[in-house]
Amino acid sequence: MSVNHGQGNKDLAKTLLVMAGGTGGHIFPGIAVADELKAQGWKIHWLGTADRMEAQIVPMHGYDISFINISGLRGKNLLTTLVMPFKLLRSLFQARRVIKTVKPDVVIGMGGYASAPGGLAAWLSKIPLIVHEQNAAAGLSNRLLARIANKVCCAFPNAFVSGIDVEVVGNPLRASIGQQALVSENIDQSHEGSKNILVVGGSLGAQVLNKVMPDSFKDLSESDEKYCIWHQTGDNNQALVTASYKQEYIDTGKVRVTEFITDIAAAYQWADIVICRAGALTVSELAMAATPAIFVPLPHAVDDHQTKNALYLVKRDAAKLLPQAELNNESITSLIIELFDQPQTLADMAKASLSAATSDASQKVAKLCQQLSISNGAKLRNNEEKI
């Protein structure tokens, strides 16, 4: 177990321990809640793993992070299944040591490897525990913790099985996405003189999109010179994808290829249509940004949660669903042309997206943390008076 410092020590009244890691879909909602409570005077500490994304992202946002040793709970083979209880027990002891050191008033689990042992350690330490599920189908860690948590909340309806008291609050989003919603008032107006397509594959990229979209764009450009594309490839894919596009498209500025997009809110504002996977954070961000989308869910996602995420907007006529098994040059090209040929449909999709968005999820979750800290403090005072 180790600690990486990103936030100076301050004598603050309350402390929140955030458990979130592995992917940006867990981490960034946690940061959004942390930022909200920090602004209210709370001290923030993080629990994660040293070999995952949170080890770099969390300190960059100014928060201390402690690491425990834990990997996925789902056994990939017999040996992994047999040793998992021992690894979980070790990580539980590590998490309890962190809790004794940090002394949090509230612990919140957002998903990721550290959430299960950290949440169990909070329960054993009698620290109020909140669980937040970002996906439309709850992950294993959150399903387990939901049975012992003081409060369970989620982004999408029916994320948990019946019998668990759940509050639907939406996904906490970065402030820049919330500001983007203010720009979305003019969603009836398309970008004059261009038809802008944003391709987003996540931090690792989506190989199927990297392969299909260059050929699709060739056909699109031959049908209409107004098409422009911004293609985010993911780590180590930029050179290969760039080479797949015609050089003339890049020279004329019709094609932009980048590994990462640092200002995703600006990218959403630029785009008329986004073609992407259906991670929970992406779905929630697109709703808030009022940007029509074509979702190509990751086919092997656990419990097919990406398809379920996508359906939240698809069923509201705010997005289109194109299963990866049906994705090819012809299918994606025809769908893009069909949408751009119906500007009113795009405008209606944008309006439907915005109506499905939740703008105050960070504030709602922060309020739950405040309420739990107050009620638990009152309980402790009553116990002290009885003694």
From Swiss-Prot:
Reaction(s) this enzyme catalyzes, per UniProt: di-trans,octa-cis-undecaprenyl diphospho-N-acetyl-alpha-D-muramoyl-L-alanyl-D-glutamyl-meso-2,6-diaminopimeloyl-D-alanyl-D-alanine + UDP-N-acetyl-alpha-D-glucosamine = di-trans,octa-cis-undecaprenyl diphospho-[N-acetyl-alpha-D-glucosaminyl-(1->4)]-N-acetyl-alpha-D-muramoyl-L-alanyl-D-glutamyl-meso-2,6-diaminopimeloyl-D-alanyl-D-alanine + UDP + H(+)
Localisation per UniProt entry: Cell inner membrane
GO cellular component: plasma membrane
Pathway annotation: Cell wall biogenesis; peptidoglycan biosynthesis
E.C. designation(s): 2.4.1.227
Topology of the protein relative to the lipid bilayer: Peripheral membrane protein
SUPFAM superfamilies attached to this UniProt entry: UDP-Glycosyltransferase/glycogen phosphorylase
Transmembrane segments: none
UniProt entry tagged with the keyword Cell membrane: yes
Broad enzyme group: transferase
Biological processes per GO annotation: carbohydrate metabolic process; cell division; cell wall organization; lipid glycosylation; peptidoglycan biosynthetic process; regulation of cell shape
GO MF term (any one): undecaprenyldiphospho-muramoylpentapeptide beta-N-acetylglucosaminyltransferase activity
Highest taxon of source: Bacteria
Protein function: Cell wall formation. Catalyzes the transfer of a GlcNAc subunit on undecaprenyl-pyrophosphoryl-MurNAc-pentapeptide (lipid intermediate I) to form undecaprenyl-pyrophosphoryl-MurNAc-(pentapeptide)GlcNAc (lipid intermediate II).
PANTHER family listed in its UniProt record: GLYCOSYLTRANSFERASE, UDP-N-ACETYLGLUCOSAMINE--N-ACETYLMURAMYL-(PENTAPEPTIDE) PYROPHOSPHORYL-UNDECAPRENOL N-ACETYLGLUCOSAMINE TRANSFERASE 1
Stated family: Belongs to the glycosyltransferase 28 family. MurG subfamily.
Protein name: UDP-N-acetylglucosamine--N-acetylmuramyl-(pentapeptide) pyrophosphoryl-undecaprenol N-acetylglucosamine transferase
